[in-house]
């Protein structure tokens, strides 16, 4: 998984897999979901991220323990 914040474009992108994007869908205004040719989620983009996410340039990543 990769998280990218483009400060110039103000877009937060979360890439779940490196599969090629076959289709994109704007789920809600400013939230774009990208899918591969099998319908699996590849990535999501949040447009105007600084208005939607507190401090988009500061990302915290946490893995929950198995079974917890």
Predicted regions located by residue number:
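Small, basic N-terminal interaction modules of short regulatory proteins
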Residues: 1-68
